[in-house]
Amino acid sequence: MSYLMLDLLSLDVSEAEAEMLRHPQVGGLILFSRNFSSREQLIALVQQIRQIRPEILIAVDHEGGRVQRFREGFTLIPAMGDILPAAKGDMVLAKRWACELGFLMAIELLACDIDLSFAPVLDLNGISQVIGKRSFSAKPDEVIALAQSFIEGMAEAGMGAVGKHFPGHGSVAADSHIAQPIDEREAEAIFNQDILPFKELIAKGKLSGIMPAHVIYPKVDPNPAGFSSYWLKQILRKELGFNGVIFSDDLGMKGAAFAGDYLGRAQAALDAGCDMILVCNDNPGVMSLLNGFVWPAAAPQHPASLLKPNAAQTAIALENASRWENAKQLAEQIQLAQQAKV
């Protein structure tokens, strides 16, 4: 079961939210900045959640740069797009730094019993302002090299990686949080450029999860990728051989309105091939699904529990205080290098 990931309104779990968390179709919880006031409060919140649903997958968007939900008491992770410039184009050095930043990002979350960061971004840095420096680079080969190192650092902390936003969000100007982006390029451009980081990292077995884009690529398929069985079943599963978890992006985003109300959006996402659907910032929307949606009788073929951390690896990583401290200093060094350029 457990097809739904939801969120919380505040710094602790209300009784109504506790009831939602107990629902058998709820398998995941995503945290936001509004759920955080301090590291101590966050740890207490996670403990409260675990008392209600010990096995639930707890996730956050904690990529670095401007997308980092927890700040006070956490290291500020540089934007991924700052790594290679800070290394002055030295790819060997940049890869080593990316690995250490992946480790740092993951271990600071795992130390608070948070399972997963939806990272890294595998989009190319093109015209999309909502992506921008969240991307490692405009060049596929640089994205592949740096993302692989970042993912390997995450794995050394015990955390799996979720690549986003398949097959690529970097070449559309519209922000799918507030609009319906349409990528008018020919299929050849997408398959020869944007999809390459996903293709290569899947082939190398580096991705445990993938999040598709709420973007329409009309020269390929009329549906947004997250609602497209062609993109998810034919391309991602069959042609690229991906066997991890497919998470929908937030079904509350404007880019998801294509599929109608929440019942329609959930059905379209699951029919297309998503294993877990996200509904954020909309409690009534969550309740409409829990009370009115006809969920699949069978459990997800690729359950989100596959993204639970490697506990033995995390235990080893938590003992490595010197690596953690050195990675913090590296993050600060890259931040200072970027500030000096501005």
Swiss-Prot record:
Cysteine disulfide partners in this protein: none
UniProt keyword Zinc, yes or no: no
Pathway assigned in UniProt: Cell wall biogenesis; peptidoglycan recycling
Keyword DNA damage in annotation: no
Binding positions (substrate): 61, 69, 134, 164-165
Keyword annotations of the record: Cell cycle, Cell division, Cell shape, Cell wall biogenesis/degradation, Cytoplasm, Glycosidase, Hydrolase, Peptidoglycan synthesis
Catalytic residues identified in the record: 177 (proton donor/acceptor), 249 (nucleophile)
Gene Ontology process terms (BP): carbohydrate metabolic process; cell division; cell wall organization; peptidoglycan biosynthetic process; peptidoglycan turnover; regulation of cell shape
Residues at the site labelled Important for catalytic activity: 175
Subcellular location: Cytoplasm
SUPFAM superfamilies: (Trans)glycosidases
One Gene Ontology MF term: beta-N-acetylhexosaminidase activity
Entries under InterPro entries matching the protein: Beta_hexosaminidase_bac, Glyco_hydro_3_AS, Glyco_hydro_3_N, Glyco_hydro_3_N_sf, Glycoside_hydrolase_SF, NagZ_Beta-hexosaminidase
Primary residence: cytoplasm
GO cellular component labels: cytoplasm
Catalysed reactions, as listed in the record: Hydrolysis of terminal non-reducing N-acetyl-D-hexosamine residues in N-acetyl-beta-D-hexosaminides
Enzyme Commission code(s) on record: 3.2.1.52
Protein family: Belongs to the glycosyl hydrolase 3 family. NagZ subfamily.
Its biological purpose: Plays a role in peptidoglycan recycling by cleaving the terminal beta-1,4-linked N-acetylglucosamine (GlcNAc) from peptide-linked peptidoglycan fragments, giving rise to free GlcNAc, anhydro-N-acetylmuramic acid and anhydro-N-acetylmuramic acid-linked peptides.
Protein name: Beta-hexosaminidase
